Amino acid sequence: MFGLFVRFTCKDETAAAAFDELVARTGEQIHANEPGTVVYAVHRVDGRPLERVFYELYRDEVAFEEHESKDYVCAFLSDREQYLAATEVDRLGFVSGKGVSLEH
């Protein structure tokens, strides 16, 4: 398993709303087309209205590379920049957890 923890900070509330719409559209495509994407969870951060946190878990690095190559993901990666003030990315190596099978 391979994962990402990503923290996005939007420029302002208008940008945050537009970013959320972009995320929703992209998420629909990920859900429909990516069996190797095990978890793609997006969260608002309590008390920090301009921040969004993504937790992404992929079957393996090949599934992540497939995800990154999709047209809708490439569009997301490009389009998101107009809404963001900052992006922080941590690459994760899975150790253990509830609800996730290592055989996935």
What are these regions, as identified by a protein language model?
Residues M1-R52, R59-S69, A85-H104:
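Short S/T/G/P-rich N-terminal loop/turn motif that feeds into the first structured element of a domain
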